[in-house]
Amino acid sequence: MPPDFWERCFWLWGLLLWLSVGSTGDAPPTPQTNCTDFQNANLLRGTNLKVQFLLFTPLDPSCGQLVEESSDIQNSGFNATLGTKLVIHGFRALGTKPSWIDRFIDALLRAADANVIAVDWVYGSTAAYFSAVENVIKLGLEISRFLRKLLALGVSESSIHIIGISLGAHVGGMVGHFYNGQLGQITGLDPAGPEYTRASLEERLDPGDALFVEAIHTDTDNLGIRIPVGHVDYFINGGQDQPGCPTSIYAGYSYLICDHMRAVHLYISALENSCPLVAFPCTNYKDFLAGQCLDCFNPFLLSCPRIGLVEQGGVKIEPLPKEVKVYLLTTSMAPYCVHHSLVEFHLQEPRNKDTCITVTFLSSSVTSSVKITIPRHQRVGKGVLAHPSPQCQINQVKLKLQASHRVWKKDQTTIIGRFCTAPLPVNDNKKMVCLPEPVNLQASETVSHDLKITCI
């Protein structure tokens, strides 16, 4: 965690305290008859746990039915033959309803024929973060008691899917721990880092908490946890500094929260859109960008994990491996998904210095670039290039040899080599497409070539 993390938190906490005076944040929609909305807690009196379980069903997706007792559940639209998804929010600094929750619930109900239960613990998650942390075990016990009522109605443990956001991810882990890891699935959306990075397995989310546990990491250098906590752990853009998020503290609250909340918006986008958010296992982000991890054979036997409501994230092996780090790149806005391509340049002759080449793909309206380096005394340099359009819709590739920094004269270096590319995953060489002729590159000059790849 950066040394200035708490300093930034306290600075922004003062801003939040000032904003909270006379403010309730996002105005909640006018509730329908017999519908219940999230509570709004007072910022200075929000530490007492006061939980609501709000049921949303395909028959009435915009109406939250308050279900507390078994009779409430039986008299509601709850269908015990369907799967059940519990959504647990995290720390609420201002004591308001999460601004994203309505869209999240709607996306879940559109994507799956299921019961959706939102766990409202705005009371108990407000004011000091550390007070909210102290409520995690108590909340986990309350949710466990509630699930017992569902199980009594014939719901199976394996049909329960908990989706926890930030601190809510560890609440979900606590519930799963109470059920000895027999719940169907837990999805952690940027599980909280403060107070949990060094916590024991019993205190935080871990692979033993459900039959399948996945986590999406987007803010590992601030509010999110930096260690793997699931069977599959997605590190989006390396797990930090998400494209499109502010990089200056002067952006205020958005600077603190944007990376952290990107996990939520990514998951919503995966539910709402058909373009896949596919990831690739790798030891670390640097190796992934360098084109060292091109398929999903190890450890997934070619079944690449995918974000969304896909059984076991698309992983089709048993037993499931644990704490596997997988990586993917995204765009700066919804639907976020990109296509990943391996790009390679093969020198005819090795050089006694590093060779840097910028590779740019051009489609009808978008350009995407990456720099690859060929180490000295070697012939091949490669990297991963992310682009919104499928590779078969790329019209041109541009190549530019980066000039050496010479003050006294122009760099007139010329190299000759072969350019090749293939869409990920690269399971064999059959996908590799190379330009038909060797390419001559002169320092600082851009060379363009048509790229003709057939859509399959």
Swiss-Prot record:
Transmembrane segments: none
Phylogenetic placement of the source organism: Eukaryota, Metazoa, Chordata, Craniata, Vertebrata
Keyword Hydrolase: yes
Alphabetical UniProt keywords: Disulfide bond, Glycoprotein, Hydrolase, Lipid degradation, Lipid metabolism, Secreted, Signal
UniProt-listed Enzyme Commission number(s): 3.1.1.111
Top-tier EC class: hydrolase
Residues annotated as glycosylated: N34
Gene Ontology, cellular component aspect: extracellular space
Keyword S-adenosyl-L-methionine: no
Family: Belongs to the AB hydrolase superfamily. Lipase family.
Protein name: Phospholipase A1 member A
